[in-house]
Amino acid sequence: MTIRHILAIRKKSLELPSDLKTFLRVLANCQHLKKNKKCRRTIFSVDFQNNQRQKPSNFHFWTVIKKFSKKILKSFIIKFGNNGTIAVVFSIFPTGATPSLTFLFQALGKGAYGNVYRVRSLHDGKDYALKQIMISSKNEGIPQSVLREITVMKHLARKAHPNIISLKSVFHQLDPVRAILKINMIMERCDWDLHTFLRNIPRGVPEQQAKHVTAQIVRALDFLHTHSIIHRDLKPQNILLNRDQTVKLADFGLSKEYSNTTAFTTLVVTLWYRSPEVLLQSYYNSTVDMWALGCIVSEIYCRQPLFVGQNEAEQLTDIFKKMGTPVGKDWPSESVIARDSFPQYRPTNLKDLSPQMSKQAIEFVQQCLRYDHSKRLSARGALSHPFLKPAVATKSRVLKQINFNK
């Protein structure tokens, strides 16, 4: 077995022997690093390459690592690659830091800038989600959405709302060979996102469960809007769900703080859940989240998107065909697109579009999908709507019948 490594200690490099036991002994003798408060973080980036056909014993590996490094390591991240490669990253913090060893073992999904992995802490034995953002030196700095997400999630973590995903830790790694900066965010891990859940259940969602899920989304939105934050990218993929039916909002890369006098015109929100004022490039506010919520509630019942378009023009046309073309004051005066650019469509009964929905659910969705955003249902108002008033936490047969591979 050979070892390739990078050991950065206050801009000094140190050659480590190629023997794993000797390496761990050196690591165990690094206790003195903790006493040096100037050395805030020491990064070990180690690749263990197994040149033999038989891979090393994972159980033995974890036992040795935990024994030798538990007291001096803050974070421990590992990834199994091809051909027996094991990539490990260690971070050492000064005295007083709580040791937490984490290893990475399952990919959960991909994003615009990186991947999401399932990780397990060797400190508390719990599973978390690791969002790893890869930034090349060719890029012009760190993307604004990444900085925004970290800022918002750190802000929200201090308030700890039960329906908003909690950020546990943020740290970075530098890969000098590939000239890549990795920003790692360790967050709560949930069992599914709403998109996956709806497409894997054997039958429709019961009314009581639909109310319970919707109520939790609304509570999270009310919390965000109360703290002057618009999510701006609400969609089923960003709504996480646990087996106990706990719902948590995630992915705040497009979220933005606002005030009562702030008006935005930037195009945001995944196409199918964009409100008309956003598609028409007009001014918008926090009610864009409520439009997206109306689309999502319909999708919970029907298990398919309410409005589907391949581009902005198609999306608007589909909305107008189903909801009717807006007239008079319903058409935004600041819109860059003229009203006569679209034919006059008559509205379709929402019951015909979503026959699975109850009368109260239809009324709720209709109030979320009003063209005039000043008349649209607010998150606070939604909590007192008759559709959500009786919502209570109940165990659902649907969740019990689903066999997901975790």
UniProtKB/Swiss-Prot annotation:
Pfam families cross-referenced by the UniProt entry: Pkinase (PF00069)
Subunit description: Interacts with cyd-1; the interaction is likely involved in regulating cdk-4 activity.
Phenotype when the gene is knocked out: Arrested cell division in the G1 phase during larval development. RNAi-mediated knockdown results in L4 stage arrest which is associated with uncoordinated movements and a protruding vulva. Impaired cell division of P blast cells, somatic gonad precursors Z1 and Z4 and intestinal cells. Severe defect in the proliferation of P blast cells, intestinal cells, vulva cell precursors and somatic gonad precursors. Mesoblast M cell division is normal. Double knockout with lin-35 rescues the cell cycle progression defect in the single cdk-4 mutants.
Protein name: Cyclin-dependent kinase 4 homolog
Keywords for the protein's UniProt record, in alphabetical order: ATP-binding, Cell cycle, Cell division, Kinase, Magnesium, Metal-binding, Nucleotide-binding, Serine/threonine-protein kinase, Transferase
Gene encoding the protein: cdk-4
Consequence recorded when altering residue 149 to K: In he110; lack of postembryonic blast cell division
Lineage per the UniProt record: Eukaryota, Metazoa, Ecdysozoa, Nematoda, Chromadorea
Cited InterPro entries: CDK, Kinase-like_dom_sf, Prot_kinase_dom, Protein_kinase_ATP_BS, Ser/Thr_kinase_AS
